Amino acid sequence: MEYLNSPFWQRQPFFPLEIQRFLRTRFEKALHDPLDRQHLVWPLILGSPGILKNFTKGIPTEELLVQAAKMLAAVEIKEPSISWHYHQELFPDTASMQEVGWVPHVSWRAWAPMVSLRIGWQLSSLTGIDPGVDYLFKCGISLFNNGLYFECHDALEPLWLNARGEEKANLQSLILLAAGFHHIQHQNSAGAQSVWKDALTRLNGRGRFTLSMGKLEIDESLRISSLIVSELDSVNGIDWGKIWQLPKPRWNLV
């Protein structure tokens, strides 16, 4: 599912390595098996600012299951209690029991609201995408359009590894395009220019191309990236505020 607005089209913080691992282990499972999108639901709820505020001594199991039910149903999981036990077995570092209920595990508790926000957008990006041969491709597009460029890279990389010829080159260019926007989110101009140097040269004038998974329009994202590169090369210094006023780039499957 894609949204016009995204909290990620602005400068983003750096997560500590342990938080990056926490996010990535759950997200990679969701990419590997669509049914494992369920593992994004639990930290999303536990780290939610509203839950943390309303359940200061922990959210009771019964309430946790109620909160999870609709999100789980949207990814074809019908039994919240079974999903919760399955998640706890795989990821014992998600939650700890306190006085009356569950709280985020100490390993990510300090970052809970930000982790919940990112995981929530990961889940929203993957929800509504049918399992099938083009699952990863459609996930990559949705993630890109929601400003989750690092996750877009992770979705497209397996396709690139298995591709051949022109398709492999096209996928590599898409991955590098997404990687450049990821660097921009951290205001790393050198990183963006490095990965975009090859990608923008390869994609120059190619606003639409055909892959085995479908036809993709990327001209809007190419236009935005070109405007950003011009700003990065400005002799007057980089105006990051000007960059963040640009429209959020997007890809369109046609």
Predicted regions, residues:
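Conserved positions within tetratricopeptide repeat
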Residues: H153-D154, Q193-K197, D219
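TPR/TPR-like (Sel1-like) alpha-helical repeat modules
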Residues: S189-G207
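Short, charge-rich amphipathic alpha-helical segments embedded
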Residues: D154-L176, T201-L211
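N-terminal alpha-helical interaction modules that lie
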Residues: M1-F150, P158-N162, R206-V254
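Alpha-helix boundary/capping segments in eukaryotic regulatory proteins
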Residues: G147-E151, A163-Q172, I184-A192
